[in-house]
C-alpha cells in the first residue's frame, strides 16, 4: 500500500508540473505574439513634401508674361516681358528688372542689318569697355519667330548691389533684330548658374514687328 501512495503522489506531482509548465509556455507565447502584432500594426508616418526652391536667378516656371508695346521713339515692334518686373526708361532704352535678372531693349536707326562681322568687329569692342570683366564673346546666327537674328552671348560682372555690396557674375544673350532701317537690340541677362533657357526663349521668340 505504501508503494501505491508513493506512486500516486509522483503521478500527481508530475501532472501538476506539466500543467504549470504548459501555462507558463503558453503565456510567454501570447506576450511575444502580442508584442509583434503591436509593432507591425503601427502605421508608417508619411514623409513631408519637400519645399521647392529655385537657385538664385532662376525665373519660376509659372512666370506670367505680358506684351510690351513702346509708345514713344520707335514703336514698330512688340515683345513679351515677365509680368511684375520693374521698368526703367532712359532715352532709347527700356529695362525690365527683377532681383538678379533683366530684359534690356534698345532701339536705333541703322543703314544695314547687323552681321557676324559687324557684331564681332564693332559691338564686341564696345562692350569690352562697358561691361566689367567682359569675357567669352560668341557670335552666332539663330532663328526666332521674327526670322534670322544675330546672337551675341558673353559674360560679365553685374553692378555692385547698393545694399549688400555683392557683385554677381552674369551671362548675357544679345539679339540684334533688324528691319527697314531699324535695329532693336534685346539683351537678356542673369546669373551664370541660373537655368533661364526656357524663359529667355519665350521672350526672344515673342519679339514681333508691327
PLM regions and their residue ranges:
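Short amphipathic beta-strand/extended segments with alternating polar/hydrophobic composition
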Residues: 79-81, 106-107, 164-166
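Sec-exported extracytoplasmic/periplasmic mature domains
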Residues: 86, 125-132, 157, 205-209
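Extracytoplasmic/secreted proteins, especially bacterial periplasmic and envelope-associated proteins
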Residues: 118, 122, 126, 199-202
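N-terminal targeting sequences that direct proteins away from the cytosol to non-cytosolic compartments
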Residues: 2-101, 180, 187-210
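A short acidic-to-branched-hydrophobic micro-motif
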Residues: 97-122
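Solvent-exposed loop/turn segments at secondary-structure junctions
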Residues: 111-113, 158-159, 183, 190-194
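Short, isolated positions in well-ordered beta-strands
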Residues: 103, 149-150, 184
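Signature of long, low-cysteine stretches enriched in small and polar/charged residues
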Residues: 128-177
